[in-house]
UniProtKB/Swiss-Prot annotation:
SUPFAM superfamilies documented for this protein: Tropomyosin
Keyword Repeat: yes
SS bond partners: none
The organism of origin for this protein: Onchocerca volvulus
Family to which the UniProt record says this protein belongs: Belongs to the tropomyosin family.
InterPro entries recorded: Tropomyosin
Protein name per Swiss-Prot or TrEMBL: Tropomyosin
Function recorded in the entry: Tropomyosin, in association with the troponin complex, plays a central role in the calcium dependent regulation of muscle contraction.
Domain free text: The molecule is in a coiled coil structure that is formed by 2 polypeptide chains. The sequence exhibits a prominent seven-residues periodicity.
Alphabetical UniProt keywords: Coiled coil, Repeat
Amino acid sequence: MDAIKKKMQAMKIEKDNALDRADAAEEKVRQMTEKLERIEEELRDTQKKMMQTENDLVKAQEDLSVANTNLEDKEKKVQEAEAEVAALNRRMTLLEEELERAEERLKIATDKLEEATHTADESERVRKVMENRSFQDEERANTVESQEKEAQLLAEEADRKYDEVARKLAMVEADLERAEERAEAGENEIVELEEELRVVGNNLKSLEVSEEKALQREDSYQEQIRTVSVRLKEAETRAEFAERSVQKLQKKVDRLEDELVHEKERYKNISEELDQTFQELSGY
């Protein structure tokens, strides 16, 4: 009987120990389950962040592509402005050559006027010395009149040429104004593009890269942005150079216009002198 009691007590103790071990095992399983749930939650959060990072990188790549396209458009506009400035330079060269030819014609007209004046003086002297030789005086007067008419024709032709030069200069001035407007618009667009690039750069810098691949792609995009910034700076420099060229051309046009006004005044004076000489000869 005592042996049975001892055996039952031992079995009870073993049962209690087994229950304790079972409780400990259940607690351990519960803790491991909670830990596993936390790990799974962290994994889900990490996956969400990775997806957001990928989306941000795709968006940044799209923004960078748009910025590159805009920069190419601006560079194309700058090249067009430079080509237009070169064309204006060629036109200015042609106008200067035409002005030189007009000055040569003016010199010829001036020489004709001097010759006519000299002939008139000679005719006056001869008239006073030999009043009885009216026929010869009349012939000299006719010669002077012919020379005066020829000088007038030359002056009129030169005047027409100068009017044509003035018209062309007005067209060049209008082209220069349009070129300046395009250069200014290009500068404004470049400023806007620079702001867009700055925003893209800030977005790239603010991305949280969680793995090595994302970090490498961000470095690549930042390198592209630096390249685009360098190209943008070059485009701004070229735009500034084009604007300075336009300003120089404008000054040159102003100078040519002043010369035209001066030459027209000289033509006017020559015409008045010719008219006066003709009137004096007609009075004889």
